[in-house]
Amino acid sequence: MKRSTLADRYCSIARSSSELMDAWSFVILRELFLANMRFDGLQAQTGMSPRSLTLRLADLAESGIIKRVAYQQSPARYEYRLTSKGKELWPVVIALKQWGDKWSGPWSDDQPPLTLHHKDHDHQLELGFICKTCGEPVDAHSTEGTMSPAMTAEREQTASDYQQAIRSKRQGGA
């Protein structure tokens, strides 16, 4: 399925993936969360070519995840700041970091590359999911999803279209 098609699906995972599913986007977000907001700093830390970085920054700005803010007039220079929409990606980025700490090592000094500390507390931070209603920890095994009627209808149509394509291919190939 094409990435542009994902943006049209009636699914929040598909739509958000169409905006973000690019490894470079997450590396840029990491840098912005680390307060590295200027083009030169982003290029230095990501290793991206100027053209690739420019394109990714434009995509993130078009999606409303970042905004470009002038910090110098002559010559014009900009920094890139997370919008409210972008700041709400923090738990997503940290969940990806924690997954990478566990599954993308081993690390040369037996420590993850970045540790987070809870400000004003004397401990490392580890992201977890807590139900806001009851306060209990939750995971994939303690939750279940309920699809909306619109999502159910789209999935049924997608399955039907797929089966029709298979039948057509078989009939044409016979």
Give residue spans per PLM region.
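N-terminal intrinsically disordered/low-complexity leader segments
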Residues: 1-8
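Basic, amphipathic "hinge/linker" alpha-helix immediately C-terminal to the N-terminal HTH DNA-binding motif
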Residues: 21, 72-95
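Alpha-helical linker/hinge and terminal dimerization helices associated
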Residues: 26, 63, 92-104
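Extended, folded domain segments that form the structural surfaces/walls around functional sites
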Residues: 37-42, 57, 89-93, 102, ...
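Canonical helix-turn-helix DNA-binding module
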Residues: 39, 43-71, 75
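Short aromatic/hydrophobic contact patches that present stacked aromatics
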Residues: 45, 79-81, 115
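C-terminal regulatory/oligomerization modules of transcriptional regulators
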Residues: 101-174
